[in-house]
């Protein structure tokens, strides 16, 4: 009886016994678990060989022929041929597998004897059935948090020679199984051969970052502050931890940080932490390598230094000063606070109308709550003096014409310098009602 059909085609010949049917390149092939046994669906007829064209048996309903192709002739009509094979006779012998790791690929080599399942069709053309094989192995895959085992498979045609596989990142058995569907349909165990990869050479990494956040209402006046650990841009100081997350075969690490085209940092640790201060665009280039894959030539298939680029952007400094605040306890505008980003220095002094210093502070995230020595200050105009340095200011920049004291009139004008803030002006304290 017909055990299973991998693909069904309409023929006038059927197989008898444990067998299965396959359609390949338009031809119908029968594979038998033991001897070939064919039966006509149109009653007794003449049986012919597709290979020789010779009559095999006349006026017969069933035949037990050798492997090959056969067609029926009845009443002068030739019917579509079939091609029959005793499957166990085509089992590979002496088949061995060896696996060779490289940086960008893995080679699997099969040696031994694989008998060809060949036949001559009704047109006299020689054909060979392409036997399917599946190559399976375990490698590593990134699941957004870590490397985990992942079973990979590759469909190929069974042959001797070398197969090229993807890079394999962990030790594993590489299993080659062939004719799975045919063997299953015949109730047989599919044959296989195993090669063991003990020392993978392939490497890669999956860098991740964690940015130190500055959240909360106490810093709500900082523009572009990093509120989430995933951000890669914002107000300085921007502190970011970089993690390589390498595959097991990685031996060496390289981190290079470029500000524009200038290399400013180079480290060889697996994980690093860096605080970005100067505004602008940065490139963080991470490379991994090992003794087998030491170079970065993308043309060389046997050499790899897997590099990943991460882009970071630091905001330019900015400092804005309000001219009024209302410390009445309603939760809105209750403090005199500047709006800022990317500052490395800050100092603010508050004077009353008589020039007396009433408050000062050095953290731009903080401000004046409108009290003097713990008591509410009188409503009216006050005077502020601010000096601050942005992270984009020249390291040798100096303040000009500002002292920590009040002088009636305007402050002396100074040469405009990027990132240097020398500000002064009136601030109006209005209490009103909540």
Task: List each model region and its residues.
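N-terminal signal peptide c-region/cleavage motif recognized by signal peptidases
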Residues: 4-6
């Amino acid at each position: 009886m017909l055990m299973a059909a991998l693909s069904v085609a309409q023929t006038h010949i059927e197989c008898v016994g444990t067998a299965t049917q396959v359609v390949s390149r338009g031809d119908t092939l029968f594979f038998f678990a033991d001897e070939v046994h064919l039966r006509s669906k149109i009653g007794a007829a003449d049986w012919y060989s597709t290979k020789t064209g010779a009559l095999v048996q006349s006026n017969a309903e069933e035949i037990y022929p050798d492997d090959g192709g056969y067609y029926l002739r009845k009443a002068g009509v030739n019917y579509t041929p079939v091609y029959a094979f005793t499957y166990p006779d085509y089992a590979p012998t002496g088949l061995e597998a060896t696996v060779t790791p490289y940086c960008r690929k893995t080679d699997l080599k099969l040696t031994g004897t694989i008998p060809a399942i060949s036949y001559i069709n009704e047109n006299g053309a020689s054909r060979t059935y392409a036997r399917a094989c599946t190559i399976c192995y375990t490698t590593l895959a990134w699941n957004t948090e870590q490397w985990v085992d992942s079973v990979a498979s590759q469909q190929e045609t069974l042959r001797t020679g070398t197969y090229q596989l993807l890079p394999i990142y962990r030790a594993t058995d590489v299993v080659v199984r062939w004719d799975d569907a045919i063997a299953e349909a015949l109730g047989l165990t599919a044959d296989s051969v195993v090669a063991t990869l003990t020392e993978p050479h392939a490497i890669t990494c999956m860098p991740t970052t964690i940015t130190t956040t500055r959240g909360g209402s106490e810093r709500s006046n900082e523009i572009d502050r990093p509120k989430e650990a995933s951000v890669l841009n914002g107000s300085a100081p921007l502190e970011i931890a970089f993690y390589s997350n390498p595959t097991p075969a990685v031996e060496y690490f390289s981190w290079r940080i470029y500000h524009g085209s200038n290399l400013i940092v180079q480290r060889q640790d697996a994980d690093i932490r860096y605080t970005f201060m100067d505004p602008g665009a940065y490139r963080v280039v991470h490379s991994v390598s090992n003794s087998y894959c030491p170079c970065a030539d993308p043309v060389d298939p046997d050499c790899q230094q897997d590099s990943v680029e991460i882009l970071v952007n630091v905001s330019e400094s900015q400092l804005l000063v309000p001219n009024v605040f209302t410390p009445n306890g309603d939760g809105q505008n209750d403090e005199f606070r500047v709006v800022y980003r990317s500052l490395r220095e800050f100092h603010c002094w508050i004077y009353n109308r008589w020039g007396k210093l009433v408050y000062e502070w050095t953290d731009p995230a903080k401000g004046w709550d409108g009290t003097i020595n713990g008591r509410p200050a009188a409503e009216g105009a006050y005077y502020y003096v601010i000096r601050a340095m942005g992270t984009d200011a020249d390291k040798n920049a100096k303040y000009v014409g500002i002292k920590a004291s009040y002088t009636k009139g305007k402050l002396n004008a100074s040469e405009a310098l990027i990132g240097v803030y020398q500000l002064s002006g009136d601030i109006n304290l209005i209490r009103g009602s909540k």
